[in-house]
Amino acid sequence: MMFRNFDDSGPPGHEPRFEPGTLVWHRRYNYRAVVVALDSSCQAPSNWYASNTTQPDQDQPWYHLLVHGSAQTTYAAEQNLEEDLSGQAVEHPLVKYFFKSFKGGKYDRNDELWPSW
């Protein structure tokens, strides 16, 4: 599993709901995506977080996502995501860079590292 910065020493209940390769739906902004990497808490710079209009709790898993139908990547808090059960592949130019294959509605993550902030 590809955790970019995941520390599992936190309190129970902070385990991530999604792993790399999982298809997700962003509840607030209504887009499909695939999880590429995750952090146990928000690792974005403070100025990025301050500019985020929603400012979800930083002390929860945050996910690096490839957005379907675009070249956009996003960083989303777990509370804003739900699993996408459509089973449909995500169309994004970086899918082939970060994943080996797609089967059964899930991507198989390779060893390419997600860049840090």
What are these regions (language model features)?
Residues 1-23, 29-32, 39-42, 110-117:
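Mixed-charge, Lys/Arg-rich low-complexity intrinsically disordered regions
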Residues 27, 36, 68:
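Structured beta-strand/turn binding interfaces of compact recognition modules in eukaryotic regulators
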Residues 35-36, 77:
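Short, solvent-exposed loop/turn and secondary-structure capping segments
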Residues 38-39, 88:
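Alpha-helical interaction segments
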Residues 42-51:
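Short, solvent-exposed secondary-structure boundary/capping segments
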Residues 54:
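Phosphate-recognition beta-domain surfaces
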Residues 58-117:
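Intrinsically disordered, low-complexity, charged/polar segments
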